[in-house]
Swiss-Prot record:
Gene3D superfamilies, A to Z: Pseudouridine synthase I, catalytic domain, C-terminal subdomain (3.30.70.660), Pseudouridine synthase I, catalytic domain, N-terminal subdomain (3.30.70.580)
Underlying gene: truA
Protein name (record): tRNA pseudouridine synthase A
Source organism of the structure: Shewanella sp. (strain MR-4)
Organism domain of life: Bacteria
PANTHER family in the cross-refs: PSEUDOURIDYLATE SYNTHASE, TRNA PSEUDOURIDINE SYNTHASE-LIKE 1
Assigned keywords, A-Z: Isomerase, tRNA processing
Sites where the protein binds substrate: 109
Family matches, as SUPFAM superfamilies: Pseudouridine synthase (SSF55120)
HAMAP family assigned to the protein according to its UniProt record, in alphabetical order: TruA
E.C. number(s) listed in UniProt: 5.4.99.12
Length: 261
């Protein structure tokens, strides 16, 4: 049978999602815990491979198993075998047409900036600290240039392996909640480092170092070297993955937990 899981994790202690030899990964920890519950080797497929230090509240994975277990085994049972910074939020049996990556129609990320003169002691791994007076409204206006299907060469990592730089951004908004500035962006898919590169350039606009038209200018240039530095990983969360209604996957609060949803 095929099982889908909703996963939440604090990525600060891991070398990213993907299983790697000799370093700790989210995938490695999950596969180990699932294999114990299933009493057989389990291999996972995920909706989005997050980088080192990046978190998720809405990661979706699937796996094949011959084990017959109830929902509690795949949630509470697996959680009992996981470290405290990884948790299964839900489990659902799905048909064989479902694939965590290829069935997804959109991914949604939130980037959380703690905008204060002094660095935080609490939540330091869950937010990115930037001082200076950030104008979230200017960032929001500038970000609207990203909407639609476009060439995002200026915002892809040099080592990105995607065959095409084109992605379709469905929505993007920048808001402020007190000391937090949140960049919320949804697209059909994302290039390597695309969200963090976008945030890095939006910050330059929010800090008054670049004009409102800069995002549009960067898109036209198609040159990564012209954009700003990549934003830090610790403020980034994969918060949601969209699938066709036929799969009826659970929908929970997006998070992260300390934010207004």
């Amino acid at each position: 049978m095929r099982i889908a899981l909703g996963i939440e994790y604090d990525g600060s202690g891991y070398f990213g999602w993907q299983r790697q030899a000799e370093v700790d990964s989210v995938q490695g920890q999950l596969e180990q815990a699932l294999s114990k519950v299933a009493n057989e080797p389990i291999s996972l497929f995920c909706a989005g491979r997050t980088d080192a230090g990046v978190h998720a509240t809405g990661q979706v994975v699937h796996f094949e198993t011959n084990a017959i277990r109830n929902e509690g085994a795949w949630t509470l049972g697996v959680n009992a075998n996981l470290p405290d910074n990884i948790a299964v939020r839900w489990a659902k049996e799905v048909d064989d047409s479902f694939h965590a990556r290829f069935s997804a129609t959109a991914r949604r990320y939130r980037y959380v900036i703690y905008n204060h003169n002094f660095r935080p002691g609490i939540l330091r791994h869950g937010v990115s600290h930037y001082h200076g007076d950030i104008d979230a409204d200017k960032m929001h206006v500038a970000a609207q240039a990203l909407l639609g299907e476009q060439d995002f060469t200026s915002f892809r990592a040099v080592q990105c392996q995607s065959k095409t730089p084109f992605r379709n951004v469905h929505s993007v908004k920048v808001t402020r909640q007190g000391m937090y500035v949140i960049v919320d962006i949804s697209a059909n898919a994302f290039l390597h480092h695309m969200v963090r590169n976008i945030v890095g350039s939006l910050l330059e606009i929010g800090l008054g170092n670049q004009p409102l038209t800069w995002m549009a200018d960067l898109l036209a240039l198609k040159d990564r070297n012209q954009a700003a530095a990549t934003a830090k990983p610790n403020g980034l969360y994969l918060v949601d993955v969209t699938y066709p209604e036929q799969y009826q996957l659970p929908k929970l609060a997006l998070g992260p937990l300390f934010m207004l949803d």
